[in-house]
Amino acid sequence: MKEKKTALGNRDEKEKSRELSAAEERRLRRFEELSDSLIGQGYRRVELTVSIVKANIFAVVLLIPLLIAGIGLFFLHNHSVSGGLGRMNPILFLVLLFALIVVHELIHGLSWSLFAEHHWKDIEFGFMKQYLTPYCTCGVPLEKGAYIFGALMPLVLLGIRPMIAGILIGSFGLLLLGIIMADSAAGDIMIVWKILRYRSEAGTIVYIDHPTQAGGVIFEK
């Protein structure tokens, strides 16, 4: 067990020290300048980021209960598999999945932009080529509720709602699509869980999305 933890720890460090694009370096410099400013004002910095590797492991684990619950409820409500996405060409299904991965990040951005100071101008997108992972980041501080709202909206809109709709209308394909998209939000779930578990007696807390890693950083005083 100790060796496994060490291996995961090494992967975490490798992830944090990955090669950044020019845009990521610019965002990181801007973030560190903001961090230094807040620390200079008496704030304490607390990292609430999650590892992409651990998020991928959690996604594998999460897929099992999602499949059991989704398929179980589907056949409790329906006695057979019917149309909709259930009859879609497998290639088109994969194309739709890739398109929804992009939409997933756009939903993060649109949701956070509602609360960001300069709205859409404060939202940027990137791609971790080492992990084939697209991401969205908000460059300005957000309140806790706003941060969580933006983090969970893709899960709700692309995962939970299609799952429920698939069960209700008897479309196994739509159910499967919802399950996959809900599972793709595993990292978002980890981030929100980490935020909700964090306890602080600080009078003021600022939530800022990390510009190059999954998750956020809080500043408290």
Task: List each model region and its residues.
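Catalytic Zn2+-binding segment of zinc metalloproteases
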Residues: 108-121, 198
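Membrane interface segments of multi-pass transport proteins and intramembrane proteases
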Residues: 80-82
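Active-site recognition of the HExxH zinc-binding catalytic motif
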Residues: 100-113, 154
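Charged, low-complexity, helix/coiled-coil-prone segments
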Residues: 93-106, 120-122, 138-139
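Metalloprotease/metallohydrolase-associated module, dominated by Zn2+-dependent proteases
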Residues: 2-78, 125-221
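Short pre-active-site segment immediately N-terminal to the catalytic Zn-binding motif
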Residues: 84-101, 147
